[in-house]
């Protein structure tokens, strides 16, 4: 991903936090030279000394069959984004778009059933733990658990991580503050999240 230096984030701890907060991502691979993508909730996990992006695809989704032939796949995590009007600047200029995004590159591997079950347990814990009647794997019926046969687990070893936080850091202090103030005035929740970033 092209990232001007002032928008680059290199701290992996910041990236991990962002991925945890924006975990619905896009996995991109190629099949016969054509890009294909799937949108899925993913986890970032440390397994032994390496970091992986983990998740699952429907067994009927043909993308998982491309992973063996792809030396690398791309995973895109998109955060909040918002239009920035040039009317918010103290001088004439062009409008822009502010956003946060992370690109992960790595080799995708299929999980065995035990690894997949462990990943599903963690996924349920992440999204259910704060709920009043939370669902946990151990309490699911064997009939429900058998639905695991309909999905394929995937783990992507992180070889490279790129993060872009384009948040008007290149503007002077007056314009920067004006942008934040105007973003808070927008009705779009994304604009508020960009202002808070």
Question: Which residues does each predicted region cover?
Answer:
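Short, solvent-exposed cationic patches
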Residues: 1-7, 50-79, 133
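Short beta-strand segments
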Residues: 21-59
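A generic structural signal for short beta-strands and their flanking turns/coil linkers
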Residues: 23, 38, 49-53, 69-73, ...
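C-terminal edge-of-domain segments
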Residues: 110-197
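A generic local secondary-structure boundary/capping motif
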Residues: 16, 93, 143-146
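Short, structured beta-strand-loop surface elements
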Residues: 60-118
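Residue-level recognition of well-ordered beta-strand positions that form the cores
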Residues: 41, 56, 76, 107, ...
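Short, basic/aromatic recognition patches
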Residues: 2-26
